[in-house]
């Protein structure tokens, strides 16, 4: 079964996120559990936690259907020790918030070397950062998102994701989220079913589908291999509809949150309905 949704706003309270997801016909959603552009946030109160859990139950969202995203400020591979510690503390707080909310996944961008340390050293720092957070939490999986490779961001090659996973001690609590726009911008072709087969065969060989814990379904304004991260609405960008139809009709993408971060929230309901229809087309066939 496919869990399909979007990254919805939690404005006005975390309990509003499941309601907003239900409004657009979603069977999955992503959210920020705090302001993503601030380092610090007030601790979650028992009332906030209870309200969120009640809302998730009301709208029939289990933890497997929810993919929280951490703060954009965090860099788990930061080359400067003081800044690295600040990021590690913030990441641990994000993991603990998920733990408190009964959530089992935390999606994050791996990190950037800022042209100050070697790629290998940065990847090792990211893995160490994950180990530190996992050792102090229970039940939450660290879900590494592939990047477009903009600037000095790492995680744009499957080999880099595999290297991070290799350095994580508890393999049962690490996974990946593949963003289609990021993959395309990083040079992984998705424009035809044949291209999708080839790209994900490579993913299966290098990373492994056992680590796939979520996806971001985004078309790309950016050009193939441009290393530029610019999302677009499904079918409106340089990837096209075929990739998303192919994903909907492949069982390897069942049972994980498939999240839209496309640029027009006004048509998320339509995009979700379209994705669901592709799944039905498979069943009919």
Curated annotation (Swiss-Prot):
GO terms for biological process: base-excision repair. Zn(2+) 3 binds at residues 182, 229, 231. Zn(2+) 2 binds at residues 145, 179, 216, 261. Binds 3 Zn(2+) ions. Its EC number is 3.1.21.2. GO terms for molecular function: deoxyribonuclease IV (phage-T4-induced) activity; DNA binding; DNA-(apurinic or apyrimidinic site) endonuclease activity; phosphoric diester hydrolase activity; zinc ion binding. It catalyses: Endonucleolytic cleavage to 5'-phosphooligonucleotide end-products. Zn(2+) 1 binds at residues 69, 109, 145. It holds the Pfam family AP_endonuc_2. Its cofactor is Zn(2+). Keywords: DNA damage, DNA repair, Endonuclease, Hydrolase, Metal-binding, Nuclease, Zinc. CDD domains: AP2Ec (cd00019). Belongs to the AP endonuclease 2 family. Endonuclease IV plays a role in DNA repair. It cleaves phosphodiester bonds at apurinic or apyrimidinic (AP) sites, generating a 3'-hydroxyl group and a 5'-terminal sugar phosphate. This is Probable endonuclease 4.
């Amino acid at each position: 079964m496919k869990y399909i949704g979007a990254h919805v706003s939690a404005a006005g309270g975390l309990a509003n996120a499941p309601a907003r997801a239900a409004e657009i016909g979603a069977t999955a959603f992503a959210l920020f559990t705090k302001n993503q552009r601030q380092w610090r946030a007030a601790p979650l109160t028992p009332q906030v936690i209870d309200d969120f859990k009640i809302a998730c139950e009301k709208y029939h969202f289990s933890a497997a259907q929810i993919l929280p995203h951490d703060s954009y400020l965090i860099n788990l591979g930061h080359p400067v020790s003081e800044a690295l510690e600040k990021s590690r503390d913030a990441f641990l707080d994000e993991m603990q918030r998920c733990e408190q909310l009964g959530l089992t996944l935390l999606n994050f961008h791996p990190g950037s070397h800022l042209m100050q340390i070697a790629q290998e050293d940065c990847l090792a720092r990211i893995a160490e950062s994950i180990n530190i957070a996992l050792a102090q939490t229970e039940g939450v999986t660290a879900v590494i998102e592939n990047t477009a490779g903009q600037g000095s961001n790492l995680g744009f090659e499957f080999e880099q994701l595999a290297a991070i996973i290799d350095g994580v001690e508890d393999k049962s609590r690490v996974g990946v989220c593949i963003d289609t726009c990021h993959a395309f911008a990083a040079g992984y072709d998705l424009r035809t079913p044949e291209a999708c087969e080839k790209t994900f065969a490579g993913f299966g060989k290098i990373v492994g589908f056992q680590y796939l814990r979520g996806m971001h379904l985004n078309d790309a304004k950016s050009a193939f291999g441009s290393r530029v991260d610019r999302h677009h609405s499904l079918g409106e960008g340089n990837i096209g509809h075929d990739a998303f139809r192919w994903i909907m009709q492949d069982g390897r993408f069942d049972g994980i949150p498939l999240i839209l971060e496309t640029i027009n929230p006004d048509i998320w309901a339509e995009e979700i309905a379209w994705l669901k229809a592709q799944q039905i087309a498979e069943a009919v066939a």
